[in-house]
Design a protein with these regions (language model features):
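Conserved AdoMet/S-adenosylmethionine-binding subsite of the radical SAM
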Residues: 2-123
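Auxiliary Fe-S-binding modules of radical SAM enzymes
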Residues: 89-166
Length: 166
């Protein structure tokens, strides 16, 4: 999470903007709002991970609610940043038509127009292992891009610019 490196990222992003470089950041947005408001002005395009639209379920599975994330996401949109919501599609968490409709309701409410559906994979398992953490998804199969087409269709039918993969 690049935005967790507050001092470094602030100086780094300032420098990039001074050089006229278009800055793209991928983030969970789970940082303090005041810091986010300061740093957002140095970022042109945001890829914003939104793991679940329901704060209770989000907290159950990630350990944190999504209120701070959604506050920062809404702020980025309010200052006219180019924002794409990225949804890591995870089995037994958010990979369902029912949850897709919950995302749609949330995204319409806050003004998201672009969505990337990211198929679940096992790439993160090694990171958990290196950190000595339990990986709760080791027995889950990867989700093929083909399996996301029905969810993509739901988003498209509801007026979103959507693609599978990022």
């Amino acid at each position: 999470e690049p935005l967790m490196q507050k001092e470094f990222m602030t100086e780094f992003l300032k420098r990039l903007k001074q050089e006229g470089i278009h800055v793209v950041a991928e983030t969970t947005g789970c940082v303090e709002h005041e810091y986010f408001k300061d740093i957002i002005h140095y970022i042109d395009t945001l890829y914003f991970d939104v793991k679940h639209p329901d704060t209770k379920i989000h907290k159950e599975k990630t350990g944190k609610g999504n209120a701070k994330i959604l506050e920062n996401l809404q702020y980025a949109l309010s200052v006219n940043k180019d924002v794409t919501a990225r949804i890591p599609m995870i089995p037994d968490f958010n990979f369902s038509n029912k949850t897709a409709y919950k995302y749609i309701e949330l995204f319409k409410k806050i003004g998201i127009k672009k969505v990337h559906l990211l198929p679940f994979h096992q790439y993160g398992s090694e990171k958990y292992k290196m950190l000595g953490l339990s990986y709760g998804y080791k027995n889950f199969e990867n989700i093929a891009k083909e399996e996301l087409k029905p969810i993509k269709k739901i988003f498209k039918e509801n007026g979103f610019e959507v693609r599978i993969g990022g």
